[in-house]
């Protein structure tokens, strides 16, 4: 037996009289895709079978993309290069070619890696360098992760529109695909590539090439034996049904078959009562017979079985591969938390040095960095403001070689993109190094560009001693900045040393700052001060304010070093402070390469605005993405009750005894990506590591053994167990690596989620890349048990 069953003894439920007949009819698995044969008229273009399954072969925009277009790639005012762009027949990728005499180079980008397709001059690059091309002829392809935007100009407006519409349709179709459809599409793509002479037949050499492409290092003798067993025509070529049979054997999931047969018995189909028993053993909330019947109607592929409320092995697999069968609780993927509590009661997704796309020494600044941050659910962005020419403030990392962008352009990007993913409020964290005149210009730009989005006065509230809620501030923009004291001179200069507010105390990290700039930063424009309604940037002087003088609008900014010191020395007091008002934590200025710190320690103490360098991928950003994966990815996650109570006794350094046992049996993986596509014989040796990130006493990591030369369907069957003291704060990170005995392991994929959103039972983990992009159809298959004391 593959793994221990945690089921009760049962009596086989009565089945409908037709069950045996239906079982016999549906026992044969649903057909897998295979290259078209001459009978279906597809020999000349076998790859189009994939687009046909997407229902797009007759779409005029897609057909135009298949023919290809000569588009101009725009990088600067003088760099406009023509490229041939053509959609590949798999519908998954776009091929483009440079026009270099004698040595044309070819490149590919994948549709699933596209974040957005914009028409017109809707990117920083086209606004700056696309003036020679009419907006109607221009488009921008924005990618996920760190890849730069692709700014293009078409020969005509109609051709540009075809690419905008075509890519939009392809993205929508890919997003709507079930896991089974993704797998079918993935197979089509590799079959098309492995069929070197495009004759819709597969020689043994082509089969070996296919196996290497999909990350399988199969023994030649075994591969040839399998090949010959499927070669019923005995002509050393597989075609049609023979290829289908080979793929079915390759894709066989014995571990799923075993689980299925535990519940279906000899009938080879699940009745609705049997499926209900499986759901109950899984620990599914709301498991009823009606729910089991609904799942059959949703995921069963065979119409005969569906009519008789029966589920075949294929339908069972489709259910387990669906979002409802995933480890992440599907009900947590929409906004499900109370959004009517004060802002201080939420973790808020926050970015540091948002304007940078690379390091903070010489990297470029870009408004596109803000667009990307908002696309990742960020709700608090940083604007590092300095004196600019012509009376216009600029944003860059001061006293470095980073490039500069206009403050007003960033505000416009906020207006256009801040609420495309989430309706909840955005906080603009101003690091202000400007004089009074340009501060007034900043205030003017904020008011005129943002208009009614900008919060300029306090809302009517039944409890003025608390911050407003995310629900009350939907669609609004808050400014975090210095606030003038009540008594001041008209020019904004009457600030005593005692009353002077600290902005981000980043000035202490920047010893190179000129004295003149420091003097400018101490002056506060009345116009800009008036906009800091709910987020007054203030030096943290005490964790014990007077009980009769609550100041919920004060926001303290701390370096990671100062925050860690407070956590160690005054853990519970810091927790209570963060239950009342906002705290922002930012990386040390010494992180010149824009590296990140682990945000978990700050979340443990209730810090809301834990700012990270979004431009730098790594486990720290994986944790951030995992924390904000739930609640509709809206950028706000309600803190646990122990971090919201003003009289909380919780201390992250002393969380108490273990309260939860987490057991995860790592069973198998499927279709892991190939790390080095340029080396056909390079196959991964995968291992799985599970990490717990929480309070210090809960942090742990364990890993499986590695499996030699199999990234296609490796098997482990190993159980990893963890004891947790504060499960409500814990994140679980699943990591797959390629084992290397002589050097650090290579990253393959990961997925991170809160323990509170982890479902029990047999589940799939859908892996993500370093940049957070889907690696579909790559998955882990695991069994999860959570025991709470």
From Swiss-Prot:
Residues 488-497 have a biased composition (Basic and acidic residues). Residues 73-101 are annotated as: Substrate binding. Pfam families: C2, EF-hand_10, PI-PLC-X, PI-PLC-Y. It is a peripheral membrane protein. InterPro entries: C2_dom (IPR000008), C2_domain_sf (IPR035892), EF-hand-dom_pair (IPR011992), EF_Hand_1_Ca_BS (IPR018247), PH-like_dom_sf (IPR011993), PH_domain (IPR001849), PI-PLC_fam (IPR001192), PLC-delta3_EF-hand (IPR039504). Ca(2+) 3 binds at residues 353, 382, 384, 431. Residues 644-769 form the C2 domain. The modification Phosphoserine is found at residues 105, 496, 573. It is found in: Membrane; Cytoplasm; Cleavage furrow. Ca(2+) 5 binds at residues 738-740. One of its GO terms (molecular function) is metal ion binding. SUPFAM superfamilies: C2 domain (Calcium/lipid-binding domain, CaLB), EF-hand, PH domain-like, PLC-like phosphodiesterases. CDD domains: C2_PLC_like, EFh_PI-PLCdelta3, PH_PLC_delta, PI-PLCc_delta3. Its cofactor is Ca(2+). Induction: Down-regulated by Ca(2+) and cAMP. Strongly activated by phosphatidic acid. Inhibited by phosphatidylethanolamine (PtdEtn), phosphatidylcholine (PtdCho), sphingomyelin and phosphatidylserine (PtdSer). Its main location: membrane. GO terms for cellular component: cleavage furrow; cytoplasm; plasma membrane. Binds 5 Ca(2+) ions per subunit. Two of the Ca(2+) ions are bound to the C2 domain. The C2 domain is a Ca(2+)-dependent membrane-targeting module. Hydrolyzes the phosphatidylinositol 4,5-bisphosphate (PIP2) to generate 2 second messenger molecules diacylglycerol (DAG) and inositol 1,4,5-trisphosphate (IP3). DAG mediates the activation of protein kinase C (PKC), while IP3 releases Ca(2+) from intracellular stores. Essential for trophoblast and placental development. May participate in cytokinesis by hydrolyzing PIP2 at the cleavage furrow. Regulates neurite outgrowth through the inhibition of RhoA/Rho kinase signaling. This is 1-phosphatidylinositol 4,5-bisphosphate phosphodiesterase delta-3. It comes from Homo sapiens (Human).
């Amino acid at each position: 037996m593959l793994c221990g069953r945690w089921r009760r003894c049962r009596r086989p439920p009565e089945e409908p009289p037709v069950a045996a007949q239906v079982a016999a009819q549906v026992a044969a698995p649903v057909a897998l895709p295979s290259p078209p044969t001459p009978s279906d008229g597809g020999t000349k273009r076998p790859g189009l079978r994939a687009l046909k399954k997407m229902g797009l072969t007759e779409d005029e925009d897609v057909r135009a993309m298949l023919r290809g277009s000569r588009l101009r790639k725009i990088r600067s005012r003088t760099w406009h290069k023509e490229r041939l762009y053509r959609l590949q027949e798999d519908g998954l990728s776009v091929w483009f070619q440079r026009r270099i005499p004698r040595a044309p180079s070819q490149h590919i980008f994948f549709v699933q890696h596209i974040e957005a397709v914009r028409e017109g001059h809707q990117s920083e690059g086209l606004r700056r360098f696309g003036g020679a091309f009419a907006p109607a002829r221009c488009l921008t392809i924005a990618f996920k992760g760190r890849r730069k935007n692709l700014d293009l100009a078409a020969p005509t407006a109609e051709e540009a529109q075809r690419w905008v519409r075509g890519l939009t349709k392809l993205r929508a179709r890919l997003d709507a695909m079930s896991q089974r459809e993704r797998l079918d599409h993935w197979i089509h793509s590799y079959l098309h590539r492995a069929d070197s002479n495009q004759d819709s037949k597969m020689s043994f050499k082509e089969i070996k090439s296919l196996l290497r492409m999909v990350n399988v290092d199969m023994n030649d003798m075994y591969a040839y034996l399998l090949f010959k067993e499927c070669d019923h025509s005995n002509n050393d070529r597989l075609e049609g049904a023979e290829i289908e049979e080979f793929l079915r054997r390759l894709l066989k999931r014995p571990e799923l078959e075993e689980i299925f047969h535990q519940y279906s018995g000899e009938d080879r189909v699940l009745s609705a009562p049997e499926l209900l028993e499986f759901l109950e053993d899984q620990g599914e909330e709301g498991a009823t017979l009606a729910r089991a019947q609904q799942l059959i109607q949703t995921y069963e592929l065979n119409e005969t079985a569906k009519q008789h409320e029966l589920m075949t092995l294929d339908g069972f697999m489709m259910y387990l591969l669906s979002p409802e069968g995933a480890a992440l609780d599907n009900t947590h993927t929409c906004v499900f938390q109370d959004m009517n509590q004060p802002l201080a009661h939420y973790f808020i997704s926050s970015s540091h040095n948002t304007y940078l796309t690379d390091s903070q020494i010489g990297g470029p600044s870009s408004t596109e960095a803000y667009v990307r941050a908002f696309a990742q659910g960020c709700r608090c962005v940083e604007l590092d403001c300095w004196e600019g020419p012509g009376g216009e403030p600029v944003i860059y990392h001061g006293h470095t070689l980073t490039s500069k962008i206009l403050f007003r352009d960033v505000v416009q990007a906020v207006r256009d993109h801040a609420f495309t993913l989430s309706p909840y409020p955005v906080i603009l964290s101003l690091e202000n190094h400007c004089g009074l005149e340009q501060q007034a210009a900043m205030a003017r730009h904020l008011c005129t560009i943002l208009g009614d989005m900008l919060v300029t006065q306090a809302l009517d509230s039944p409890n003025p001693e608390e911050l407003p809620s995310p629900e009350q501030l939907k669609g609004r923009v808050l400014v975090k900045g210095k606030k003038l004291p009540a008594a001041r001179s008209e020019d904004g200069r009457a600030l005593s040393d005692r009353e002077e507010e600290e902005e981000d105390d980043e000035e202490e990290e920047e010893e190179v700052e000129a004295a003149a700039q420091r003097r400018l930063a101490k002056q506060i424009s009345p116009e800009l001060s008036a906009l800091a309604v709910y987020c007054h940037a203030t030096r943290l002087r005490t964790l014990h304010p007077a009980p009769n003088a609550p100041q919920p609008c004060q926001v303290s900014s701390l370096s990671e070093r100062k925050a860690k010191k407070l956590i160690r020395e005054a853990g519970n007091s810091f927790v209570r402070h963060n239950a009342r008002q906002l705290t922002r934590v930012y990386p040390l200025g010494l992180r010149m390469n824009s590296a990140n710190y682990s945000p978990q320690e700050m979340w443990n103490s209730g810090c809301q605005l834990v700012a990270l360098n979004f431009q730098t991928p790594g486990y720290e950003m994986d944790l951030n993405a995992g924390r904000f994966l739930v609640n509709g990815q809206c950028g706000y996650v309600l803190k646990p009750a122990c971090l919201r109570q003003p009289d909380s006794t919780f201390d992250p350094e002393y969380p108490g005894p273990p309260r939860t046992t987490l057991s995860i049996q790592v069973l198998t993986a499927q279709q892991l990506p190939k790390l080095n596509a340029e080396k056909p014989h390079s196959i991964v040796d995968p291992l799985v590591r599970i990490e717990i990130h929480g309070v210090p006493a809960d942090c742990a990591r364990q890993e499986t053994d590695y499996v030699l030369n199999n990234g296609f369907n490796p098997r482990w069957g190993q159980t990893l167990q963890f004891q947790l003291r504060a499960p409500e704060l814990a994140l679980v990170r699943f990591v797959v690596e390629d084992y290397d005995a002589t050097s650090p392991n290579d990253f393959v994929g990961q997925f991170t989620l809160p323990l509170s959103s982890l479902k029990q039972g047999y589940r799939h983990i859908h892996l993500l890349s370093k940049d957070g992009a889907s690696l579909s159809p790559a998955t882990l298959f695991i069994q999860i048990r959570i025991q709470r004391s």
